């Protein structure tokens, strides 16, 4: 039986399970940043894009499930996150999407399914909007596409545990280990002002999309998720009960089942 981590106490103490060993990892230089990536398994590619302040290690429960199911799992540390660097420019999802394309080019991946969590979901959908031939589909979990989609911030113990783990990981992985607060402030500025897609912008998205919303998401309004599903052509809405913004860590089996059902359709 799966052991739940609904309050993230295990994640705060230990992190997610470690990513598997791989011989295929490295860096790609792109537009003022050095972007770290790693790949696992073989088969059709699925790119996992983590959330704000996190790193690829947050996908420790998802990578093995994808590999077992016959997919090639690719993780990327977003610019300025984890092992990746950044320049002095403000963060933007457009820049992050260009970083993903640079990794795809390095790995000779013409087209992939994109699984995005929070900021990673925004990055994935913007990539799909800008370069639809590169995206087989987008699994869009727990993010907004305009500023009206976010709830008023309310600190909770679960959020505190997540930030505590992110702070520890940043100190261990980053080239600027003592700059977490400045990093957090820069990411927060991006999150407050971006993205800002109109309903017409959403209507232009032409790839398969699943809008995935958890029952207790601390940051994203459920009505916004449903609005996205209505306005993106042929998008599906997936509801995850009993979990929050941190579903991939809280109940991995439930989250993995939703990912696998989606990628099996878009990569068939």
Walk through the language-model features, giving the residues of each.
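Short beta-strand/loop motif that positions the catalytic acidic residue
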Residues: 205, 211-213
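Active-site loop/oxyanion-hole signature of alpha/beta-hydrolase fold enzymes
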Residues: 68, 75-115
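Active-site nucleophile elbow and catalytic-triad environment of alpha/beta-hydrolase enzymes
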Residues: 185-201
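Catalytic active-site module of serine/aspartate enzymes centered on a nucleophile-bearing elbow/loop
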Residues: 241-268
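Conserved HGGG/HGGXW glycine-rich cap/lid loop of the alpha/beta-hydrolase fold
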Residues: 33-83
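Flexible "cap/lid" loop of the alpha/beta hydrolase fold
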Residues: 122-167
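Alpha/beta-hydrolase fold catalytic core
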Residues: 1-46, 71, 264-268
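Acidic catalytic loop of the alpha/beta-hydrolase fold
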Residues: 216-220, 245
């Amino acid at each position: 039986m799966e052991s739940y981590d609904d309050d993230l106490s295990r994640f705060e103490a230990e992190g997610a399970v470690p990513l598997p060993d791989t011989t295929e990892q490295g860096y790609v230089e792109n537009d003022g940043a050095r972007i770290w990536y790693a790949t696992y398994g073989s088969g059709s590619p699925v790119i996992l894009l983590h959330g704000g302040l996190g790193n690829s290690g947050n996908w420790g429960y998802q990578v093995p499930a994808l590999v077992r199911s016959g997919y090639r799992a690719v993780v990327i540390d977003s610019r300025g996150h984890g092992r990746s660097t950044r320049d002095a420019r403000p963060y933007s999802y457009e820049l992050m999407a260009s970083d993903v394309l640079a990794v795809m080019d390095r790995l000779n991946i013409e087209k992939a399914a994109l699984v995005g969590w929070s900021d990673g979901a925004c990055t994935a959908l913007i990539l799909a909007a800008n370069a639809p031939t590169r995206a087989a589909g987008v699994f869009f979990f727990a993010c907004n596409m305009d500023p009206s989609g976010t709830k008023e911030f309310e600190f909770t113990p679960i959020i505190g545990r997540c930030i505590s783990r992110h702070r520890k990981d940043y100190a261990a992985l980053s080239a600027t280990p003592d700059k977490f607060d400045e990093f957090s402030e820069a990411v927060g500025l991006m999150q407050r002002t971006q993205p800002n897609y109109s309903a017409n912008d959403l209507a232009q998205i032409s790839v398969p999309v699943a809008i995935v919303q958890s029952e207790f998401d601390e940051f994203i309004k459920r009505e916004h998720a449903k609005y996205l599903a209505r306005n993106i052509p042929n998008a599906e809405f997936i509801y995850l009960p009993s979990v929050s913004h941190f579903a991939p860590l809280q109940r991995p089996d439930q989250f993995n089942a939703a990912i696998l059902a989606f990628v099996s359709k878009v990569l068939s």
